């Protein structure tokens, strides 16, 4: 009875250790109990396995100990096991004749013997793990053998084909089997692709806690982990914090080797571990790596173990022994994963996943297997690496079985392991437990791999073909060069071609241009230099490689800088400057200013060209200007055909070559004076393509014959008038009008810009030579009355040139020509050289010396500084001595008429030169008599519009006079002649109606008008005053002519409000809606009686004469 109880105690302790460790290796307990006589009992092994299968891990077991039903079942299994052991011992007759003391001694030695066997097994397993990587090359086999392969005598037991035993002693070099059940393991997240059973994978671990845990696991002979694929491939972690971070299906893997390494980027210490997956597992529960969770788990374990109060003292003692880990030396052996909690890593409770049963003879599985093998064969023909992997896998299959069709599951795993599929696809294969579905998914991934391999092979062949072709061409060209070098033939063509290729390598040619260049360079290489086409192609390639393909200057859109530049270059012109700043501000917001064509319209000399230069400076763009005034050949814009001798590209292409940037500012000057269609084409029509933002992105020059992008070019045009610009061309441009300057603006421009520049160019920069403000004002009144400042600039330059002449005369400087001195020096040098010819060496030395002296003399003459004018020499130009410098005045008075006779009125006109005063004169050709017939004669080179205006004004005047003064019959017999002075100047425009009507009425009423009144406006037949244009220019002209009152249409009040104050200053505006407003201002003092009787004496005589004739 004592023997029976002790045997139960030994058995109970062994079973409890197995439950805690989770080490349920098949029949291993039978090997460990050989020394105690417990050998080969199959029922014992079966009951032991049932007992183990009651719980998947140790935590569940301890909870079940509190359940009465589970505890009762445990006692039943224990009783059956002990009973079987006793019956087996009684059947064999062991221990019957032995004394009871000896039996008791054997039973007490059971536990140390078993523990010794465990130590021996662990040493063997450590040796197996160290040599596993070296022994296995390529995919490893997970199939177990049927019998032990170690040599032994006596009874031996098979252990998955890994270990053999004889007399209960395992072989020293035998492999330690991996556990079939391992409920709780450390979890390791894997990124990018999952692991598959039977196929090695190296992972890099950077977490220090995980590295220490793996090292400790290896030292404890338990290097097992659970590897799970991360759902987010961008996450880089070695610890799982939440279960939803990874897929719940992974692999149970063994760390076969681990060695330290370093991160190449950060230099941090890492560990490279080689993992060998054994089987699929499922994540049941995650134990996150938090201290709070660890404390909670320990508290739950303590409570669970504290309530264990079962009837068996042996079970209670074993549980207490496992809790008191510090008091027992075998604590680490009894708890395989408990030590990992100290490293704060993630632990998981897992369960094994087994493949579903399948029919090896299924036609679907066999067909899928055959198709996979076929795809493998095709890939192996394209990819060498695949070929090696397939060979290794085939060798491993042949070592375990003779037919690949017997293991389709391994074939599917191998296909997934070697394919570069998507993460989700590979994970689906790992989660597939149905072999048919796994084969289908593996085949899909493998088909994609085949497509990638075919594409890669095609690309590789194409690249290889190109490389071979280039190498062949290079080899032949080098041979050709060598042959020419030996024959002494060197025409420079090869160097020319190399220079073209070198220039192209620095450019970014579009694909179409690159193709043209390659074709032309190939053609050039086949031509002889003496052929005429060689020169044509050479020039063409020179132009292609000279254009700035892909070169763009960096723009700047600084508003303050642009404003500063505009103020430096121009005075006034506030409206124009604001418009340009708006343009730059829009470019700053958009980051570009392409697609805009600006047209500056204004009289000559107002700064249109200089404004364009200022815009280029403010935008940091290159500037190019060309004029199209009088251009009649379309080839100037579009270029000539290459077939012509001396053919050249158009002006725009030449601008790109000169500026060396694709975004210059090109100024097209005098666009209103461009020629029209003729035998050489229409240049204006060619400009349509050039200036159209929708078309100039692929501008086709006749010479280049390739599309050129001009959309980044900023085009600025200038014109004096919009009348002659073709309407389609005008629609493509944004017009900005530049008006003339008033006297105050001209004075400031002359003082701040024109005078300093002219003074410097005359060499009087440091001289005491000045022009007074009164002189400038007098210069504008009597010499320069144009709207711009070009004539003023010429007169100022003339003044400074005469002043320079006077300064030089005052200084009495010797004016001996410098050239004579140089000639004399050269003659002296030649004489010295001829005298020193006695010695060759002396001659050489002296001639060299003299030549150096001559060079120094020339340099000293060239670098001679400007003349300094003493302060005592002073020249002042004022209004009194102005005529000494520029001659007598051209305009002696401000107005043509100081007092206007009847019929003379000051009108205002707009011309391409700006505004001007235009007088209208009306006179009676002969006195009023009874025989004269009323007629109207017009002179002054009037245009058709002005002729119609005069006829309309004449009719309106007759109607208005008859209405206002019915007794005044002036127009019944008046023979009138209307003239506009300066008959050599053509005149036309729709704004002279009011002026002509006022002239007719002034003559009819025989009243002279105020000479300080200027007027403009067009009349209708009923007397309505219509809107006109160019009010600013006309106001400037009125002020320049000394007018004090300006009459204009009421509809132009908005234009008047926008005029600068310096223009409106001194002018009294009168906005007329009907002619009655004009009449009241001009003839307000004429009463009805006076108007009716002004010609009463003349008409009295006429009536008397007619009465006599009728009698």
UniProtKB/Swiss-Prot annotation:
It is found in: Mitochondrion matrix. Residues 85-177, 288-311, 819-866 are annotated as: Disordered. Homohexamer or homoheptamer. Organized in a ring with a central cavity. It comes from Kluyveromyces lactis (strain ATCC 8585 / CBS 2359 / DSM 70799 / NBRC 1267 / NRRL Y-1140 / WM37) (Yeast). One of its GO terms (biological process) is chaperone-mediated protein complex assembly. Residues 1-21 form a transit peptide. ATP-dependent serine protease that mediates the selective degradation of misfolded, unassembled or oxidatively damaged polypeptides as well as certain short-lived regulatory proteins in the mitochondrial matrix. May also have a chaperone function in the assembly of inner membrane protein complexes. Participates in the regulation of mitochondrial gene expression and in the maintenance of the integrity of the mitochondrial genome. Binds to mitochondrial DNA in a site-specific manner. Residues 145-167 have a biased composition (Gly residues). Residues 185-450 form the Lon N-terminal domain. This is Lon protease homolog, mitochondrial. Pfam families: AAA, Lon_C, Lon_lid, LON_substr_bdg. GO terms for cellular component: mitochondrial matrix.
């Amino acid at each position: 009875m004592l023997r029976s109880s002790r045997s139960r105690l030994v058995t109970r302790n062994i079973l409890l250790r197995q439950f805690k460790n989770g080490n349920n290796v098949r029949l291993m307990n039978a090997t460990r109990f050989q020394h105690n006589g417990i050998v080969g009992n199959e029922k014992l092994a079966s009951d032991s396995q049932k007992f183990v299968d009651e719980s998947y891990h140790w935590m569940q077991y301890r909870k079940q100990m509190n359940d009465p039903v589970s505890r009762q079942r445990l006692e039943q299994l224990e009783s059956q096991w002990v009973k079987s052991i006793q019956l087996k011992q009684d059947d064999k007759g062991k221990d019957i004749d032995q004394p009871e003391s000896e039996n008791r001694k054997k039973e007490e030695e059971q536990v140390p013997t078993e523990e010794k066997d465990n130590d021996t097994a662990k040493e063997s397993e450590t040796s197996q793990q160290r040599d596993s990587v070296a022994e296995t090359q390529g995919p490893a086999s997970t199939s177990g053998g049927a019998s032990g392969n170690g040599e032994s005598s006596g009874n031996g037991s098979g252990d998955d084909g890994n270990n053999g035993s004889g007399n209960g002693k395992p072989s020293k070099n035998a492999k330690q089997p991996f556990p079939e059940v391992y409920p709780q393991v450390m979890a390791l997240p894997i990124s990018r692709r999952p692991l598959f059973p039977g196929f090695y994978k190296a992972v890099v671990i950077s977490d220090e806690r995980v590295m220490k845990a793996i090292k400790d696991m290896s030292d404890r002979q338990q290097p097992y982990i659970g590897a799970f694929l991360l759902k987010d491939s961008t996450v880089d972690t070695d610890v799982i914090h939440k279960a939803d971070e990874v897929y719940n299906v992974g692999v149970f893997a063994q760390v076969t080797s681990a060695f330290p390494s370093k991160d190449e980027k950060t230099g941090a210490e890492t560990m490279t571990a080689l993992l060998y997956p054994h089987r699929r597992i499922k994540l049941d529960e995650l134990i996150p790596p938090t201290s709070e969770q660890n404390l909670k788990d320990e508290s739950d374990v303590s409570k669970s173990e504290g309530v264990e109060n079962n009837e068996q003292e042996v079970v209670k003692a074993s549980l207490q022994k496992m809790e008191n880990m510090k008091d027992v030396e075998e604590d680490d052996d009894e708890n395989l994963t408990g030590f990992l909690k100290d490293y704060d890593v993630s632990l998981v409770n897992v369960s094994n996943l087994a493949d579903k049963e399948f029919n090896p003879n299924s036609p679907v599985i066999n067909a899928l297997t055959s198709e996979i093998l076929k795809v493998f064969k095709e890939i192996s023909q394209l990819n060498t690496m695949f070929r090696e992997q397939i060979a290794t896998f085939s060798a491993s299959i042949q070592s375990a079985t003779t037919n690949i069709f017997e293991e389709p599951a391994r074939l599917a795993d191998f296909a997934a392991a070697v394919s570069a599929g998507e993460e989700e696809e590979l994970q689906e294969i790992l989660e597939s437990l149905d072999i048919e579905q796994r084969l289908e998914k593996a085949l899909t991934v493998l088909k994609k791999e085949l497509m990638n391999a075919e594409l890669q092979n095609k690309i590789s062949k194409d690249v290889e073909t190109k490389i071979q072709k280039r190498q062949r061409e290079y080899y032949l060209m080098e041979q050709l060069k060598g042959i020419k070098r030996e024959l002494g033939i060197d025409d420079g063509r090869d160097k020319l071609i190399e220079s073209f290729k070198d220039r192209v390598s620095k450019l970014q040619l579009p694909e179409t241009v690159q193709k043209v260049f390659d074709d032309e360079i190939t053609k050039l290489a086949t031509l002889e230099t003496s052929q005429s086409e060689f020169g044509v192609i050479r020039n063409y390639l020179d132009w292609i490689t000279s254009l700035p393909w892909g070169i763009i200057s960096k723009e700047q859109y600084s508003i303050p800088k642009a404003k500063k530049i505009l103020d430096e270059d121009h005075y006034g012109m506030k409206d124009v400057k604001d418009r340009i700043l708006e343009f730059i501000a829009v470019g700053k917001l958009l980051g570009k200013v392409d697609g805009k064509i600006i047209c500056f319209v204004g009289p000559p000399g107002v700064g249109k060209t200089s404004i364009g230069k200022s815009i280029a400076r403010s935008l940091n763009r290159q500037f190019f200007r060309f004029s199209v005034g009088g251009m009649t050949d379309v080839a100037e814009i579009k270029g000539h055909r290459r077939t012509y001798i001396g053919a050249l590209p158009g002006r725009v292409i030449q601008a790109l070559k000169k500026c060396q940037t694709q975004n210059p500012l090109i100024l097209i000057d005098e666009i209103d004076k461009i020629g029209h269609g003729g035998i050489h084409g229409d240049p204006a029509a060619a400009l349509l393509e050039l200036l159209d933002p929708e078309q100039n992105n692929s501008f086709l020059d006749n010479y280049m014959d390739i599309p050129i992008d001009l959309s980044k070019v900023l085009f600025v045009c200038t014109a004096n008038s919009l009348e002659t610009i073709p309407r389609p061309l005008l629609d493509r441009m944004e017009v900005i009008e530049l008006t003339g300057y008033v006297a105050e603006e001209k004075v400031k421009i002359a003082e701040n810009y024109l005078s300093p520049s002219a003074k410097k160019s005359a060499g009087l920069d440091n001289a005491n030579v000045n022009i007074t403000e009164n002189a400038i004002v007098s210069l504008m009144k009597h010499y320069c009355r144009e709207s711009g400042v070009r004539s003023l600039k010429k007169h100022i330059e003339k003044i400074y040139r005469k002043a320079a002449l006077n300064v030089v005369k005052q200084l009495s400087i010797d004016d001996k020509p410098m050239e004579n001195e140089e000639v004399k020096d050269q003659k002296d040098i030649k004489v010295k050289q001829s005298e020193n010819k006695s010695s060759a060496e002396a001659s050489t030395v002296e001639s060299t010396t003299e030549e150096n002296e001559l060079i120094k003399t020339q340099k000293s003459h060239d670098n001679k500084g400007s003349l300094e004018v003493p302060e005592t020499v002073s020249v002042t130009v004022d209004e009194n001595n102005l005529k000494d410098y520029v001659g007598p005045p051209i305009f002696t008075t401000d107005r043509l008429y100081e007092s206007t006779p009847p019929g003379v009125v000051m009108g205002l006109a707009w011309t391409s030169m700006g505004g001007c005063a235009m007088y209208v004169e009306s006179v009676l050709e002969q006195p009023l008599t009874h025989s004269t017939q009323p007629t109207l004669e017009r002179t002054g080179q009037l245009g058709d519009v002005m002729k119609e205006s005069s006829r309309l004004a004449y009719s309106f005047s007759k109607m208005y006079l008859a209405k206002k003064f019915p007794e005044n019959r002036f127009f019944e017999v008046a023979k009138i002649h209307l003239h506009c002075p300066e008959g050599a100047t053509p005149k036309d425009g729709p704004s002279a109606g009011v002026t002509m009507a006022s002239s007719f009425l002034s003559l009819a009423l025989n009243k002279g008008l105020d000479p300080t009144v200027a007027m403009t406006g067009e009349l209708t037949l009923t007397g309505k005053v219509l809107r006109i244009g160019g009010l600013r220019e006309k106001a400037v002209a009125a002020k320049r002519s000394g007018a004090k009152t300006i009459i204009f249409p009421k509809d132009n009040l908005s234009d008047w409000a926008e005029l600068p104050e310096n223009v409106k200053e001194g002018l009294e505006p009168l906005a007329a809606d009907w002619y009655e407003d004009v009449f009241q201002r001009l003839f307000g003092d004429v009463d009805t009686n006076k108007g009716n009787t002004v010609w009463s004496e003349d008409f009295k005589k006429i009536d008397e004469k007619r009465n006599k004739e009728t009698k």
